[in-house]
Amino acid sequence: MVDLMTVIMVRYSLFLTWELVLLQLLLLRLSFHVSRTKILVLVRISIILHHDENAYTQSQYNLYTGPLTLRFLQRVYYMHFHIYIFNAIPLRYVKKNDPMSGPSYEMRYNKNER
């Protein structure tokens, strides 16, 4: 099973800075506990907060082949979030009690939600 976070990390790291990637991973972990509307709001806020051309390296900026605009970023974000988040099988955290290592959590598919 491919970890959903790994897929998103690989996809976003192609054209985003590591700071923005880490922020999105944090928001995605939180997004399993909020509604889709809140996810859209979080994504929009994160884009606005990181809409700074100086935060991108020259090589990453060249991938856009044009000016870096908030509208373009929103289109890319909504497209990928729709593919990887909104259509993904919902996950839930399950607590495991391991006598050797103590309590821990793992992500499992939640078949009761869709």
Swiss-Prot record:
Protein name: Putative uncharacterized protein YBL065W
Superkingdom to which the source organism belongs: Eukaryota
Other facts: Partially overlaps SEF1.
